[in-house]
């Protein structure tokens, strides 16, 4: 296998977190007298961090102060409810097991708040990730490549032996900015057509296809 380090996005790639993200978003909105959003709307709001999620979810006329209040409420609620309905996508655990058996290092780079990343890694991927990096102060979030670079440096990974897997245009752009290839996860929050429109060169309909692509 050419790739010795396989780095994954989290939301919409390893885990289906949409129900919990939508639940926390709507809890935060309604606590401040704002209208709730549909799950499909939230699906398109996620991917660029919680602040951007909240900015997209609140009405356009909402003040910066109100946005900040909704953001704080979201964080408090989501910390306690980030794993109420979340689950791994079918085939993910088998893919990770196969990669580990093949001697690959596996890691996560996500724009999800780091507290959520670490909690979900502990719940789902204990002993299966060599590194996990979520959004936090002091490091630029995706599509800037710094988070990928930080994980690669920690693992001693070389660019020509590293690949990123994600379900969004942000993931494609992040990999491009880092100078590594990307596999688009068509089972995630965006879908095949969207990924193709945003420049995906490698696409997988399911985790089993990821494994096949990694063998080529």
Predicted regions and their residues:
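Substrate-recognition "cap/lid" segment bordering the active-site pocket of phosphatases
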Residues: 84-87, 113-165, 169-178, 192-194
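Substrate-recognition element of Asp-dependent hydrolases with the DxDx(T/V) motif
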Residues: 92-122
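Active-site neighborhood of HAD-like aspartate-dependent phosphohydrolases
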Residues: 1-44, 55
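Short acidic-hydrophobic, aromatic-tinged amphipathic segments that line or gate anion-handling sites
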Residues: 202-206
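Helix-loop "lid/cap" segments that line or gate small-molecule binding pockets
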Residues: 28-29, 49-63, 120, 151-152
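Glycine-rich phosphate-binding loop signature in dinucleotide/nucleotide-binding domains
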Residues: 1, 101-104, 155-161
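Metal-dependent phosphoesterase signature
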Residues: 55-94, 102
């Amino acid at each position: 296998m050419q790739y010795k380090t396989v780095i994954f996005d989290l939301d919409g790639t390893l885990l289906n977190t949409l129900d919990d993200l939508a639940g926390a978003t709507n809890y935060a909105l309604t606590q401040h007298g704002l209208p709730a959003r549909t799950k499909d709307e939230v699906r398109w709001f996620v991917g660029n961090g919680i602040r951007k999620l909240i900015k997209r979810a609140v009405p356009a006329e909402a003040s910066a102060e109100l946005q900040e209040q909704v953001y704080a409420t979201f964080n408090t609620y989501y910390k306690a409810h980030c794993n109420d309905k979340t689950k791994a996508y079918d085939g993910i655990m088998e893919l990770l097991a196969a990669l580990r058996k093949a001697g690959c290092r596996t890691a996560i780079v996500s724009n999800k708040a780091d507290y959520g990343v670490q909690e979900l890694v502990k719940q789902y991927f204990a002993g299966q990730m060599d590194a996990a990096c979520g959004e936090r102060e002091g490091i630029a979030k995706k599509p800037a490549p710094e988070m990928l670079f930080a994980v690669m440096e920690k693992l001693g990974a070389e660019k020509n032996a590293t690949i990123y897997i994600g379900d969004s245009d942000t993931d494609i752009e992040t990999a491009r900015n880092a100078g590594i290839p990307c596999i688009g996860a068509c089972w995630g929050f965006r879908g095949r057509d969207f990924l193709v429109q945003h420049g995906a060169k490698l696409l997988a309909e399911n985790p089993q296809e990821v494994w096949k692509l990694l063998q080529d």
